[in-house]
């Protein structure tokens, strides 16, 4: 489905309208030889699906119904999703907000013969860092482990449950999980179940194909370093993705309280063969939904930027967007998604150690009501320079130890005061000043966020420059 908006930028029309556009057929490039020669043609059989649309009309200033602006739209959409059973309101406990701490444990690079697994955080390193965070007063933590397995994320089969002694044996991982679970810290395995490569697994029975029957491939040679073991990636068959999620989650559910899924959370692909469609997007959605639902029966589910059809099963929304797409010029960015999801799941921002840690960024987390997240390694991040994880260019915990405390305390000092409140409104009384309104059991709390370089007097309270305050 496309959203078509008029007028276009070249037309001087004084009103705007938008409407959905559903595409039952499309042109594609049909290849007929190995050289890539081909022609454009239509799909032989159009797609088959039912169309259903729900319209909610908003008007006025909110005195009767939802306000006719983005806050009213977000709240109306949230109400619709709750009515449909896609979102469920959850009781949020008082106290400190959570923080997400992920770890890059290893990855692989080319060696003189074959490949070499580069270890940046072993089991003891994870334990040491989490204990240090606790010693600093950061106790409400949940964590995901990336590259925990033998051959790491890059070369291990998506369902593989094998360990490397350099990182930690199975028993050491189980002990790590159970020890910290007793302290209230949830540690999970993280895995991408969609992105595959030919050194990881056979494409013949595992990779998705384009409608022209060529494998769906992405050339990443301009992104990956020269010594990286792979340069092309493909996409797993939806049926395989679902199978692998079930298989790996079933192996770890005995001692892990949650499971972190990447790739499958926000990538949805169809697949074809010479006879036509094998799995449509609708089929793929159903396969992955059922697999994630099954995994969530015994564990919490942590999803990276998940698509809406998975929100029903999402306990933690990771890497939530906090800016615009920058495809068009816009006057402002607003927390539409965050208002929709508020009170139904935990929502975390981008990794703060990748330039999301300034005073303005801390205020953005408060404004958007999202919890901070970091990704760490015990060893210096330059060890990952020749791996697929080379984009994790600044992760060494020792460099971010004090910053993690500053960011967490800055966000927690405000958001901990409104835990369990319902987010009901957002106003901009003047440029650079935001007032978010929350309600709990009839009591109102307002959070003033001052992005400006000057003190601001608002709601009878002086909020200092680049800071936030709570008025109850």
Region locations from a protein language model:
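Short secondary-structure junctions and interdomain/linker hinges
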Residues: 84-88, 140, 187, 372-373, ...
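Active-site-proximal substrate-binding groove within the catalytic cores of carbohydrate-active enzymes
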Residues: 2-19, 193-256, 265-472
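An active-site-proximal structural segment forming one wall of the substrate-binding cleft
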Residues: 69-81, 122-132, 234-260
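A structural motif corresponding to the C-terminal end of an alpha-helix
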Residues: 132-138, 173-187, 247-257, 290-301
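Carbohydrate-recognition beta-sandwich/jelly-roll modules
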Residues: 1-116, 127-136, 140
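Aromatic-lined carbohydrate-binding/catalytic grooves of carbohydrate-active enzymes
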Residues: 92-179, 183-240
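Conserved beta-strand positions
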Residues: 143-145, 189, 261-264, 303
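Generic alpha-helical structural element
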Residues: 62, 66, 115-118, 122, ...
